[in-house]
Amino acid sequence: MESTESYAAGSPEELAKRSPEPHDSSEADSAEKPTHIRFLVSNAAAGSVIGKGGSTITEFQAKSGARIQLSRNQEFFPGTTDRIIMISGSIKEVVNGLELILDKLHSELHAEDGNEVEPRRRIRLVVPNSSCGGIIGKGGATIKSFIEESKAGIKISPLDNTFYGLSDRLVTLSGTFEEQMRAIDLILAKLTEDDHYSQNVHSPYSYAAGYNSVNYAPNGSGGKYQNHKEEASTTVTIGVADEHIGLVLGRGGRNIMEITQMTGARIKISDRGDFMSGTTDRKVSITGPQRAIQQAETMIKQKVDSATERTTD
């Protein structure tokens, strides 16, 4: 899964007039319904959004009224080197928060390339697999109508079964700022109709319980970020048969990287010949909160057991 930085922008005047006011009471109620949106940014871009001491993200929350969370440094969406930003609030607050973030990222990128013509860019939304059917619609009718109305390119990735526990798909939007934001309006309105989606507001990594997100309080916090309470970190060492260490590592370290990313635990494997006392099992040391250790231990066992079962069949 390739990693792409995706930015877009618009002038303050465009941002103010782009989103139409609700026409009736039902639309007004929908606009106030709690919702959220998640999207990917590079690690460097995440730092720009946070700002010094959390000043930028605190300002964005105060202006938009939305809550903005990020996955931690080096905690990426599986298969990428991108972090997740989640914005939650009413539809209006979420859209306003997203516009502020994308406008800042694009203005910085635009200053670097010096291009006078606004390029077509990409933004990748993170959407639960269970909610993608509503975006696609029967026979693809809904997504086709969204493409026609917004003029943006919209592509939904297949569910990647390579990564254990991953239940999200990427919805890639390509186009100008106006095209992307119109597509986001349409998609977010459709997602908010799904009660399961609206209730699923936990953290940027709702499927990876081992991760802690970083939160920034919008007012009265002096711009300092607040972390979820962290559990005490411990180390547990387990034994894995020498011939099965390759299953834990994976090709090019893929498996151990996946386990580390999905659980938040740190994993260290002993050198060849360095065995658990009285065995030929290599030492696998797992460090982190108890819950992360348990998850990592389970995933390691599954990697080994799946290969053992194939061998005995």
Swiss-Prot record:
PANTHER family (UniProt xref): KH DOMAIN CONTAINING RNA BINDING PROTEIN
UniProt protein name: Protein BTR1
Disruption phenotype: Higher accumulation of ToMV in infected leaves.
InterPro entries for this protein: KH_dom, KH_dom_type_1, KH_dom_type_1_sf
Region annotation (Disordered) ranges: 1-34
Gene Ontology molecular function: any one: mRNA binding
Keyword ATP-binding: no
GO annotation terms (biological process): regulation by virus of viral protein levels in host cell; RNA splicing
Residue ranges, compositional bias (Basic and acidic residues): 14-34
Tissue-by-tissue expression: Expressed in leaves, stems and siliques.
Signal peptide (UniProt feature, chain positions): none
Lineage: Eukaryota, Viridiplantae, Streptophyta, Embryophyta, Tracheophyta
Role according to the record: Negative regulator of tomato mosaic virus (ToMV) multiplication, but has no effect on the multiplication of cucumber mosaic virus (CMV). Limits the spreading of the virus. Isoform BTR1S: binds preferentially and directly to the 5'terminal region of ToMV genomic RNA, and affects the efficiency of translation rather than mRNA stability.
Description of what induces expression: Not induced by ToMV infection.
Listed GO CC annotations: cytosol; plasma membrane
Cross-referenced CDD domains: KH-I_BTR1_rpt1, KH-I_BTR1_rpt2, KH-I_BTR1_rpt3
SUPFAM superfamilies hit by this protein: Eukaryotic type KH-domain (KH-domain type I)
Residue ranges of every copy of the KH domain listed in the record: 34-102, 120-188, 233-300
Main location group: cytoplasm
